[in-house]
């Protein structure tokens, strides 16, 4: 049994790149096609209690039917999600499946009374008004205040630079820096 476990584990690791992803709607049946056979295909579900579980002889928690090559999943539920690995006992042929169980999306016809009431609400709809002085958003006030502060800082920096330049360079006569401060 240990050699069979190691054979399956090594085969799965090498075959991980060749898996087929299958999405099965909840409650449907689906047949996983096994590899070409020389004797009989053994199917295992990975991630079970013993890391893998040979599933053709089991009845719980999943119900399946097996023939010599294929595995049919019956009345699929969320328990069926996982990795399925089918391999031929006497050759190196295998198939690897990732089964995902999906919920069917059903469309529901809308209620006609609700549609009529929605039509009435469209008739009474009014367009939004422009913001007045009472409805100015706080973000707009913050942006205007930030711009005013930055402009004041730039003006203060320019004045300080002009005063410092005149103090340290008294002999230079720059037309822009003729301030009598």
Swiss-Prot record:
Pfam families tied to this protein = Adeno_E3_CR1, Adeno_E3_CR2
Q: Which family does it belong to?
A: Belongs to the adenoviridae E3_20 family.
Which positions are glycosylated? Answer: 29, 57, 70, 75
Describe the task this protein carries out: E3 proteins seem to be dispensable for virus growth in tissue culture cells. They are potentially important for virus growth under special conditions; E3 region may help adenoviruses to evade the immune surveillance of the host.
Annotated protein name in UniProt: Early E3 20.3 kDa glycoprotein
InterPro entries in alphabetical order: Adeno_E3_CR1, Adeno_E3_CR2
| Record's keyword terms, sorted | Early protein, Glycoprotein
Protein species of origin:
Human adenovirus B serotype 11 (strain Slobiski) (HAdV-11)
Presence of keyword tRNA-binding: no
